[in-house]
UniProtKB/Swiss-Prot annotation:
Every F-box domain range: 61-109
Top-level taxon of origin: Eukaryota
Originating organism: Arabidopsis thaliana (Mouse-ear cress)
Protein name per its UniProtKB record: F-box protein At4g05010
Region (Disordered): 38-57
Pfam families assigned: F-box
InterPro entries (alphabetical): F-box-like_dom_sf, F-box_dom, FBS1-like
Length: 164
């Protein structure tokens, strides 16, 4: 039987033989299932050759991954903190280098990308223009500092005036 667009149609065994197909008569392991096997000899009896895993990974690696780990860590030391999180997801070699860069470099140096104040650039420019200002820079939402007034000095002046 063969499936056509109209439905099933019976074909003779000669037509199957002409196509190079034949029925398997001995189907003990297959139960009632029928399979077709080509009578033509296959061109390649050997299974496809597997590529070694190191060859496939070498061809797929990027130029950044092919760098030596020490050089890769030095390159990653110049990347911002926020970008390191996305770089971890690239590959295993870059992930290892990111972890090493965090341990050795980012704990001690490289500042974060975002500035702590809204207009920090303007504040820094205004401070550089007027070098006479000795006031400390405070963030915009900092708690109010209580200023302690030395009241004893005021009382001493008043007492001197009163007891003259």
């Amino acid at each position: 039987m063969a499936y056509l667009s109209d439905g099933f149609e019976m074909k003779s065994t000669r037509e199957y033989e002409r196509l190079g197909l034949g029925f398997v008569r001995f189907t003990r392991g297959l139960g009632r299932k029928r399979i077709l096997i080509s009578k033509r000899a296959p061109e390649n009896d050997s299974p496809p050759v597997k590529r070694p895993s190191h060859e496939t990974t070498e061809s797929c690696r990027s130029l950044l991954e092919t760098l030596h780990q020490d050089i890769l860590i030095r390159v990653l030391c110049h990347v911002d903190h926020e970008d390191l999180a996305t770089l971890k997801r690239v590959s295993k070699t870059i992930r290892k280098a990111v972890i090493e860069a965090k341990k050795s470099h980012f704990d001690y140096s490289t500042p974060k990308k975002r500035l702590p104040f809204r207009d920090a650039i303007l504040i820094l420019d205004s401070n550089s223009n007027s070098s006479s200002q000795d006031d400390e820079m405070e963030p915009p939402n900092a708690p109010i500092r209580r200023r302690f007034i030395n009241r004893e000095s005021d009382l001493s002046k008043i007492s001197m005036v009163l007891f003259k």
